[in-house]
Amino acid sequence: YEKLMPINSGHKDYVVIVASGYNQGVSPVPLKVYVGMKDRLADGSKIDYATANERDSFLARNGLLYGKLYGMAVENTTASTLVEKVDPGAKMMEEYLKNPNSPDQFAARWYPTSYQWGGWDKTVAVKDTEMYLWKKESEQPKGYTFFNGDKKAEHPAGDPSGLPRYAQNMTKSGALIGVDFGEFDFGNLLNLGNDLPEYLTSNVIKMVPAVDGALTLELGGQGKVKGGDASIHMEKNKAQMIAPDGLYWAKTTDGDYLIVDEDSGNDFGERKYVLTINKDMQVKSGHLLAISGGKHSSRYAQGVSALGGAFTKPGGNEFSGSCPVTALIAKKADGSFYTVEELQGTARQEIRGSKSLSEQTYIGVVQARPESSGDVEAKGGDAGGQIFQFNIKLK
């Protein structure tokens, strides 16, 4: 997996974890979430913490001993409006995202396959888990089909408010979708809240399609590159997302924003940008934050690097995520910093949510393999690059 991200289940007995990534390198596969029940052993029975070992106690408390992976599935009639042919063996999600005329939203359910982990003494080979089951006809839920796509869907980002919804980078196609569960119903049909749900329900929003013209970034007079600028992806010559990887959702007094890192090997400089979204998870605008590296980099043409003497040769860079530190450096009315105890639970987001976007502070990272000589090589470093702090002031 690229990222395992818990989202608020709204229920004391259940956990929900977005499981984005690679399905062991096998396509097609749907987007997935893990649903687990707390205080249960692998067979579903109640755990006795008085006799359980430390490992199982920890896993059971967090709902990780008893659960299943649930994949996005679409009712067959609805699916026929999204793609030309409903086929679990095809990359339907990619077809949907690349079609400029496909619906902007659709309803989906999330169903498990027949596989469920049976415990430490019943472990099977990875190939015998759910990884090959999503496309099998016999595994399709009655009246529904798993809405399979490419294995490469990298970072998700959850709504910081705690609402059960998230944005998902569709890395292979170059798109962004939103998933809104509304309110989880763990007691649907005959379950009555005493076991894992038969399915989850959600609304899916196409936030940025994988279509040329879908995204042109505002530059604020910056972002010049060889022969053009970074308002579009210069190497691909397309005004769209290309290989979006890192993703962070910021909720401020100004509204909601998504910070995106592309990982496309852009010869004209990898892009980091911020998308402004509304309450319905619709993208309203995009602004360039930074570009880095690329074989056409003017910095690399001069043989310079962030760490002196580390330049090797021109090549691609990669931004690697954004970490909010606003609450860690914020001060109280008396001028003192918040204590560790005061920053527990939702406190950090409450502090961030009380400030405007321009008052937020983030830490970012650039992986720069073209800067891997000198001290980086001498110390056996994986790659050069830099750690940087940044603020965002949109104009």
Model regions: which residues?
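Conserved small-residue
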Residues: 1-395
